[in-house]
């Protein structure tokens, strides 16, 4: 019998984060993976709008359980570099996949992307599933 593998899902409480969550849970359910929901605040800022509280974390774990997926929330402090945090969490969990959400951008925005998503796509040594929320 093979051991379970892990998917790391980057989660923020936005439509982009929800798209990543849904895609990641689908993938985990299909392949029998565990999930780590990475919700990493900047330098432990508890006023960060992307930082989820304990009740929301519990709700996300329950949503995963409802579809048969074991999940936990990781709120590792990422300081100034979220890519490094993803790298560390992916390595620590031996992740087979990372799922991130992407914002829709204008044509000009696509040309001048200096985004964390682009850096993740270029720098992370784990397969990445990047999804957009529905229009």
What are the residue ranges of the model-derived segments?
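Small/aliphatic-rich secondary-structure junction motif
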Residues: 2-54, 67-69
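Glycine-rich, Arg-bearing micro-motifs that act as flexible, cationic patches
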Residues: 100-123
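Conserved acidic residues
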Residues: 5, 96, 125
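Short secondary-structure boundary segments
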Residues: 39, 97, 101-103, 132-133
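A structural preference for short, hydrophobic beta-strand core positions in alpha/beta folds
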Residues: 37, 73-75, 130
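Structural beta-alpha unit
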Residues: 1-2, 66-98, 104, 118
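Short, flexible loop segments at boundaries between secondary-structure elements
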Residues: 126-135
């Amino acid at each position: 019998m093979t051991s379970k593998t892990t998917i790391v899902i980057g989660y923020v409480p936005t439509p982009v984060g929800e798209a990543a969550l849904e895609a990641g849970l689908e993938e985990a359910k299909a392949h029998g993976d565990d999930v780590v929901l990475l919700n990493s605040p900047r330098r432990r800022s508890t006023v960060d709008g992307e930082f989820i509280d304990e009740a929301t974390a519990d709700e996300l774990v329950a949503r995963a359980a409802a579809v048969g997926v074991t999940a936990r929330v990781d709120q590792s402090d990422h300081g100034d570099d979220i890519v490094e945090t993803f790298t560390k969490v992916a390595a620590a969990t031996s992740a087979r996949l990372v799922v991130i959400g992407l914002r829709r951008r204008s044509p000009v925005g696509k040309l001048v992307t200096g985004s964390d998503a682009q850096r993740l796509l270029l720098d992370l040594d784990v397969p990445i599933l990047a999804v957009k929320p529905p229009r």
